[in-house]
């Protein structure tokens, strides 16, 4: 492991809650429905993040907890039962219904696990009911996916068939390209979790080799290990370097030579390096500060330093699983500072003192920092954009070069005007 400085902070934090992950999960599994048990604030958050009007009947909704529910003057379980019945009568195509806890439901100790169990007995397998927490008390926004996948693992049947399981949501076109590369390598049995249909859960067992596509799935990994799966240790497939080592790790697990991997991906690498150059010209030598929100921060920092030659000031991450991130940390330069957790006021003080060229942060901090003359990039964009893989390296770099390019244009126009 490289000589990295690890620190831990506690205090006030500024992050989205785990409900936000519903935005990409409901698109991934169109036969599923996500029912948040929460407040009107929860409903507004998801609707705004998804950019979908509620009358368009998206595959998510909110069972609103009113003041009488929070005060204990009504039986919230009965009300939830009624809402579920109404929902299923209107949307008979639902195959899996996720009951998603929120801050309000956690506060009043609403037992969604028991509710899901009762509903499963009543509907006798016609619809599967699972539950997880998206509460901001417990989770940051990407951890919502971790909770959802963990909830699905008990539904996955056993199998001793040898397979590669890609774990973590990917854009469909990125997933298709990955599977094509694996087929060319000779790994034909490749499945994804979550699948594109909630009813098509992969079977798992001792011959299942798990390759993570996202770094925020600690609980999911632990439960897959308990089911006998082998976890392949690898960096994450962001950028040329991370993606190459990711493919090499998979090939090694299936006893495929590194020579064959390089033979297949070399054309992709050549094209990606060429496409990366224009962004590298802008990013090279720029100073970067990453505030914690998505758990993608370490992988992004590795890519931006090693492939775009940015200078790292500080990498913040909400949580740090050193086992999952070991291969990423090994690729960081010596003396890199990683801060787990957050005391937002102290971190903002360090940002102002360092005066970086670019800050990766949550939406709530971006505008105030921009007002102080500091260029920012929303970290949530990394989750909504197809950034994985060798051929997406230039697009990933472009997300960071864009605000710097914009800043250069605005500065030059200001100088001309003056």
Swiss-Prot record:
One of its GO terms (biological process) is light-independent chlorophyll biosynthetic process. Signal peptide: none annotated. GO terms for molecular function: 4 iron, 4 sulfur cluster binding; ATP binding; metal ion binding; oxidoreductase activity, acting on iron-sulfur proteins as donors; oxidoreductase activity, acting on the CH-CH group of donors, iron-sulfur protein as acceptor. It is an enzyme of class 1 (oxidoreductase). It holds the Pfam family Oxidored_nitro. Component of the dark-operative protochlorophyllide reductase (DPOR) that uses Mg-ATP and reduced ferredoxin to reduce ring D of protochlorophyllide (Pchlide) to form chlorophyllide a (Chlide). This reaction is light-independent. The NB-protein (ChlN-ChlB) is the catalytic component of the complex. HAMAP family: ChlN_BchN (MF_00352). Protochlorophyllide reductase is composed of three subunits; ChlL, ChlN and ChlB. Forms a heterotetramer of two ChlB and two ChlN subunits. This is Light-independent protochlorophyllide reductase subunit N. It comes from Prochlorococcus marinus (strain MIT 9215). The gene is chlN.
């Amino acid at each position: 492991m490289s000589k990295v400085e690890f620190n831990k902070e506690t205090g006030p934090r500024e992050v989205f809650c785990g409900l936000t992950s519903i935005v990409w999960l409901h698109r991934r599994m169109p036969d599923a429905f996500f029912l948040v048990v929460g407040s009107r604030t929860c409903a507004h958050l998801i609707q705004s993040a998804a950019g979908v009007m509620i009358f368009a009947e998206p595959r998510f909704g909110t069972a609103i907890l009113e003041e009488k529910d929070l005060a204990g003057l009504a039986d919230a379980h009965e009300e939830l039962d009624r809402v579920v019945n109404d929902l299923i009568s209107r949307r008979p195509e639902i195959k899996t219904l996720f009951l998603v806890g929120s801050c309000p439901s956690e506060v009043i100790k609403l037992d969604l696990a028991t509710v899901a169990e009762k509903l499963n007995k009543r509907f006798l397998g016609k619809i599967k009911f699972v539950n997880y927490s998206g509460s901001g008390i417990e989770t940051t926004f990407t951890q919502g996916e971790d909770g959802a996948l963990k909830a699905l693992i008990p539904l996955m049947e056993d199998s001793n068939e040898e397979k590669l399981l890609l774990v973590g949501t990917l854009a469909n076109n990125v997933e298709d390209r990955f599977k094509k590369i694996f087929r060319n390598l000779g790994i034909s049995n490749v499945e994804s979790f979550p699948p594109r249909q909630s009813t098509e859960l992969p079977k798992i067992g001792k011959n299942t080799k798990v390759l993570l596509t996202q770094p925020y799935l600690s609980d999911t990994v632990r439960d897959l290990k308990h089911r006998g799966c082998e976890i392949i240790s690898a960096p994450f497939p962001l950028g040329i370097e991370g993606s190459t080592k990711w493919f090499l790790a998979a090939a090694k697990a299936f006893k495929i030579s590194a020579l064959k991997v390089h033979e297949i991906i070399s054309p992709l690498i050549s094209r990606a390096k060429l496409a990366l150059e224009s962004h590298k010209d802008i990013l090279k030598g720029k100073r970067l500060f990453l505030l914690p929100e998505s758990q993608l921060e370490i992988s992004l920092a590795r890519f931006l330093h090693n492939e775009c030659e940015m200078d790292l000031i500080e990498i913040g991450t909400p949580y740090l699983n050193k086992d999952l991130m070991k291969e990423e940390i090994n690729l960081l330069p010596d003396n890199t500072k990683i801060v787990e957790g957050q005391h937002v006021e102290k971190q903002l003080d360090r940002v102002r003192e360092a005066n970086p060229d670019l800050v990766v942060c949550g939406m709530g901090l971006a505008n105030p920092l921009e007002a102080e003359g500091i260029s920012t990039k929303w970290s949530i964009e990394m989750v909504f954009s197809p950034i994985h893989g060798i051929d997406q390296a230039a697009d990933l770099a472009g997300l960071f070069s864009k605000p710097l390019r914009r800043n250069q244009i605005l500065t030059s126009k200001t100088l001309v005007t003056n």
